[in-house]
Regions:
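A nucleotide- and high-energy phosphate-metabolite-utilizing enzyme signature
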Residues: 1-168
């Protein structure tokens, strides 16, 4: 749908710019198609495919830290830039309006974490500190853009957190 296309196009164009600038170590033009390991998860109405004309989009941005074991800090900085620029590109008003209001606050502990964090850090957070409302929010989560395989793998690993056998 339109939201997926808008997020996907903005993500790949911004990742391509970072790759061209050499800011994503070891990544080249062939890595742009899967956003060089970055994933955008759609949450809430966007995740469920229930957007209406006034909906914002709730996104969680992650990157596959296994691809950047040797240059984690540089990759992390590049993905944070991509996320900030993507949110601005989608939500800043122009003469024609804006594409979507974009909310990045559903990520793990948004007051202290960067706008894009590693999948490993997010997974550790959910396993140790995840709250019931986060479990509920992840029910509708889906990979919206970026590295589909890595994103689906992340969601699969979170399945025991989301679908606990016992709620105590």
């Amino acid at each position: 749908d339109f939201a997926d296309a808008a997020v996907g196009r903005s993500l790949t164009s911004l990742v391509a710019a970072e790759v061209k600038r050499g800011k994503l170590p070891g990544q080249g033009p062939n890595d742009v198609a899967d956003a060089a390991g970055m994933v955008v998860l759609a949450m809430g109405k966007a995740g469920a495919g229930e957007l209406n004309y006034s909906s914002d989009i709730d996104l969680i941005c992650l990157f596959d830290d296994e691809r950047y074991a040797d240059d984690y800090a540089e990759a992390r900085a590049a993905f944070i830039r991509v996320t900030r620029r993507m949110a601005a590109l989608l939500s800043e008003p122009t003469g024609d309006g804006y594409v979507f209001r974009t909310d990045l606050r559903l990520r793990p502990d948004p007051s202290v974490t960067p706008v894009c964090l590693s999948m490993d850090a997010a997974e550790r957070y959910y396993e140790s500190l995840g709250r019931p409302w986060e479990r509920a929010a992840l029910i509708k989560a889906r990979v919206m853009a970026g590295d589909q395989k890595a994103g689906q793998g992340f969601l699969d690993r979170l399945s025991p957190f989301v679908w606990r056998k016992h709620l105590d």
